[in-house]
Amino acid sequence: MASLRPPTLDEVGLEAALRDHVGAFARRSGVACSVRVDLAGRLDGELETVVYRVTQEALLNVARHADAGRLWLELDGTGDRVDLEIRDDGVGFEPATSSALVRDGHFGLVAMQERVEMAGGRFQLDTQPGAGVTLRAMFQVAVPS
């Protein structure tokens, strides 16, 4: 499982890794990006990996499908919650069930949902044609005593 964890998370931490990845995405794609991270401390290693991998896949989807001009990434970790939200102002799409997404070849969205749910989180996707996409991954975490 360690081989699935990007080394950059151990080298620089989640916040810096996200900022680096989003910055590189912005330079490559021309999409203007905003990143806001508010974490009280380091997250569990597995959760850091999930957040990073979901972000990677979400940005890949934006580059391939969204025709977006702006992207916002917000990561909040306060108390017993960690919430990731990634929004774009792209073309959006008609909401569909997981089975319809797979049938239509949208494996990335399904993979993100499965990754989040396997980590005990909740995945939410809000979109409409012409209204961009908002992706949320929400996790309950143990608070150190």
Language model feature labels by segment:
Residues M1-S145:
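Coiled-coil dimerization/phosphotransfer module
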